């Protein structure tokens, strides 16, 4: 989260689920919906989670404790990628990509995106 604040990243894209076939694939690095969690010098509040067909969009309010920086960050998580395979169709992935591009444009688009 410190990197997100330092680089002023507004969009995070995640293409994996935390668990697949009962195995841990990724560390969950965000708080549950409507909850706040502090990571070092950065406080993260999960404002909302919206489920779309094939992906989730989370909106976070980020606050840097020592630099008094606040910002809004969006995370898009594709949840239909099968373990050790490829999706049957790309329509949901393409739809998520369009949402990501739109979000980048709406948030200024000058900061790097985290994938």
Swiss-Prot record:
The keyword Hydrolase applies. Pfam families: Y_phosphatase. Its EC number is 3.1.3.48. It catalyses: O-phospho-L-tyrosyl-[protein] + H2O = L-tyrosyl-[protein] + phosphate. Keywords: Hydrolase, Protein phosphatase. The keyword Nucleotidyltransferase does not apply. Signal peptide: none annotated. Substrate binds at residue 83. It comes from the Eukaryota. Residues 1-115 form the Tyrosine-protein phosphatase domain. GO terms for molecular function: protein tyrosine phosphatase activity. Belongs to the protein-tyrosine phosphatase family. This is Tyrosine-protein phosphatase 22. The gene is STY-22.
């Amino acid at each position: 989260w410190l990197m997100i604040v330092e680089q002023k990243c507004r969009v995070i894209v995640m293409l994996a689920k935390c668990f697949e076939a009962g195995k841990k694939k990724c560390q969950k690095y965000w708080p549950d919906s409507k909850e706040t969690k502090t990571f070092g010098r950065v406080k993260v509040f999960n404002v909302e989670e919206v489920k779309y067909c094939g992906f989730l969009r989370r909106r976070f309010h980020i606050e840097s404790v020592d630099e008094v920086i606040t910002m809004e960050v969006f995370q898009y998580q594709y949840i239909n990628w099968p373990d050790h395979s490829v999706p049957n169709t790309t329509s949901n992935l393409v739809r998520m990509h369009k949402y990501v591009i739109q979000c980048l444009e709406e948030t200024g688009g000058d900061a790097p995106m985290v994938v």
